[in-house]
A protein has these predicted regions:
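Histidine/acidic-rich helix-loop-helix segments that form or flank divalent-metal centers
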Residues: 33, 37-46, 52-56, 117-177, ...
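Glycine- and charge-enriched loop/helix tracts that form the active or gating conduit
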Residues: 1-70, 74-99, 103-117, 193, ...
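Core structural elements
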Residues: 23-24, 133, 215
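Charged, alpha-helix-enriched surfaces in structured cytosolic catalytic cores
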Residues: 13, 49, 103, 141-144, ...
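Terminal helices and disordered tails flanking the catalytic cores of nucleotide-processing hydrolases
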Residues: 139, 148, 173-285
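Active/binding-pocket-proximal capping segment
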Residues: 84-88, 102-103, 120-132, 146, ...
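Short polybasic/polar patches that bind polyanions
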Residues: 19, 113, 151, 210-211
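A residue-level signal for conserved active-site and pocket-lining positions in enzyme catalytic cores
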Residues: 14-18, 54, 104, 129, ...
């Protein structure tokens, strides 16, 4: 029945009805503990209100993502601590919720086990909650750091994780759903995912060349691959085994220094062109 509520267009209304009828406390009592729990200064809503508002604004229609939105701050009540503000932030105290993401993932796992959800669904929701606080700074990000994030959460979960961040943001009463940094992350994901301009896209590799040309590992292998790649960039139809093998024999007999320099220029030019196209798609600079 809970899945039916989450799958519906009125999931928010359904959860609020359970809350108002005093039934939610018997299904997910951990969620009720957020009622009246205030957050830090930039949050408009209590923990409970923020949770249901996040559910309401989840852009993804899959019930697992909606459930992750509802439970993503489930551990905030138990992790709340008050500490003095830094002098630059004014006077008084501010609420902190250290490790609420990690603890919340464990709490969510217990909830879903208690409610007899499948292991696959539980793993999905838990992973999203555990990683919903991932750090991303446009000025510091690199392709390798994005690759690490992809390896950590799985490429198949990245779009869902971004949807959870959007739900979290809108559920805080912030009008702009997808800030620049999230659009920039999508751009970097696209860039890393395709990584199109690389010798890896060729239908031949270094091992193939060594066997074919009977040569030892060395810079000549890389030079031949670079030249082949530059030619394939110009004409994708050349990326076939027959042509690449024939052309490799020809290149093996040539002085490749100048050819490789020209190839590198062509490769960099193509990378920049592709990068600009992806940036336009996600409205980033």
């Amino acid at each position: 029945e809970l899945i039916k509520i989450l799958e519906s267009e009125k999931a928010y209304d359904g959860i609020m009805a359970l809350h108002e009828l005093k039934l939610l406390q018997y299904i997910i009592p951990e969620l009720e503990r957020g009622v009246g729990v205030e957050q830090s200064r930039h949050h408009v809503f209590s923990v409970f209100k923020h949770s249901v508002e996040s559910l309401k604004h989840t852009p993804n229609k899959k019930w697992q993502i909606k459930f992750a939105s509802l439970l993503h701050d489930i551990a905030k009540p138990q992790t709340k601590r008050m500490k003095d503000c830094y002098p630059s932030a004014g006077s008084g105290q501010v609420a902190t919720f250290y490790n609420h993401d990690l603890i919340g993932a464990k709490v969510a796992a217990k909830i879903m086990s208690r409610l007899k959800f499948s292991k696959a669904d539980t793993d999905k929701v838990v992973l999203l909650i555990k990683n919903h606080m991932f750090y991303y700074n446009v000025g510091e990000v690199t392709a390798s750091s994005v690759r690490r994030l992809i390896r950590k959460v799985g490429e198949e979960n990245l779009a869902d994780l971004i949807d959870l961040r959007v739900a979290d943001r809108l559920g805080s009463g912030v009008p702009k759903a997808k800030p620049y940094k999230l659009r920039h992350l999508e751009y970097m994901m696209e860039k890393v995912r395709f990584d199109a301009v690389s010798v890896k896209m060729l239908k031949i590799n270094g091992d193939d060349l060594m066997k074919l040309l009977k040569i030892e590992p060395g810079p000549k292998i890389g030079a031949i691959l670079d030249v082949l790649l530059s030619e394939v960039i110009e004409d994708q139809e050349l990326n076939n085994r027959e042509y690449l093998e024939k052309r490799s024999f020809e290149l093996n007999k040539m002085d490749l220094k100048q050819l490789r320099e020209q190839a590198k220029e062509k490769i960099e030019e193509k990378k920049m062109e592709d990068d600009e196209e992806i940036k336009k798609e996600y409205y980033v600079k």
